[in-house]
């Protein structure tokens, strides 16, 4: 199946003709594996190395430190993709995007791995000892803490969580099919003169459907796990994404489009659907006009 915008995307990678483009897929895969391994290690490293009072003191912070480090580095690399634009264009011209894409394809997989990480318990590899009571408390579902294990609760949360997972994935696939890999791959951040203004109706209800998808994907994990850790991880992810959207991407859009984009910001929410627009959004997912 041919991906929309693939030709335009590939056109801006002049040193990677034909199958050489697979380098970027391998780079993303390696980045994701490294990020995942780091998170798994940080989830249990203090439980593995420490004991006694030191275990009780430091173990609860291991998973949080792991998420914080990967999130910081991931968003930093994505920021560098935007930050280095002018210098790279001046120095490399038509190869600027190709050079910058390396930053994005290391950073973005780490952000995606953070979302996947929310779906899994922190003791998946290294068990929590009986004396590590704070870590155990943070990793248990909130309902389990108060009412014990309840099959109905687990079932309802799982159904809703997997529904959100489906909505997030479906939103990404719909966005990709409509706008193409060239837009999703941020080619026109570097070459805006080649782009076309997008007028799809989805932009009348939400400014950043892709980021909405990422929020929804991660929220599905929160409902499935429903632990204090999952809520903390989700909060950290929201903060990182919002800082990036508001102070990196939208700053660039304001420079490009000026007051017209500021007016658009006032009329349409960035990543949260208004209740009145839920029906329209579902039509978008089902490939129907509003």
Regions found by a protein language model. Give the residues of each.
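Active-site-proximal inter-transmembrane loops
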Residues: 187-211
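Membrane-anchoring alpha-helices and their flanking helix-loop junctions
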Residues: 1-196, 218-290
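Conserved beta-strand->loop/alpha-helix structural units within folded catalytic cores of enzymes
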Residues: 214-215
């Amino acid at each position: 199946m041919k991906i929309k915008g693939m030709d335009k995307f590939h056109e801006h990678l002049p040193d990677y003709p034909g199958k050489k483009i697979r380098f970027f897929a391998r780079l993303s895969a390696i980045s994701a594996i490294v990020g995942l391994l780091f998170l798994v290690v940080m989830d249990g490293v203090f439980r593995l190395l420490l004991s006694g009072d030191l275990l009780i003191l430091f173990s609860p912070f291991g998973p949080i430190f792991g998420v914080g480090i990967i999130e910081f580095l991931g968003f930093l690399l994505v920021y560098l993709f935007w930050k280095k634009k002018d210098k790279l264009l001046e120095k490399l011209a038509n190869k600027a995007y190709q050079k910058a894409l390396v930053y994005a394809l290391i950073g973005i997989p780490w952000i995606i791995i953070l979302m996947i990480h929310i779906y899994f318990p922190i003791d998946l590899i290294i068990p929590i000892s009986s004396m590590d009571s704070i870590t155990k408390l943070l990793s248990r579902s909130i309902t389990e803490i108060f009412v014990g294990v309840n099959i109905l609760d687990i079932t309802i949360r799982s159904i809703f969580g997997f529904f959100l997972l489906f909505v997030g994935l479906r939103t990404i696939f719909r966005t990709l099919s409509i706008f193409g890999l060239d837009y999703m791959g941020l080619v026109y951040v570097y070459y805006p003169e080649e782009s076309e203004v997008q007028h799809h109706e989805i932009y009348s209800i939400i400014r950043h459907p892709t980021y909405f998808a990422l929020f929804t994907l991660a929220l599905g994990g929160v409902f499935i796990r429903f632990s204090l850790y999952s809520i903390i991880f989700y909060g950290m992810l929201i903060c990182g994404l919002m800082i990036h959207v508001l102070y990196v991407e939208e700053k660039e859009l304001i420079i490009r489009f000026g007051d017209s984009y500021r007016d658009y910001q006032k009329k349409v929410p960035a990543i949260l659907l208004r209740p009145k627009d839920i029906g329209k959004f579902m039509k978008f997912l089902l490939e129907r006009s509003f």
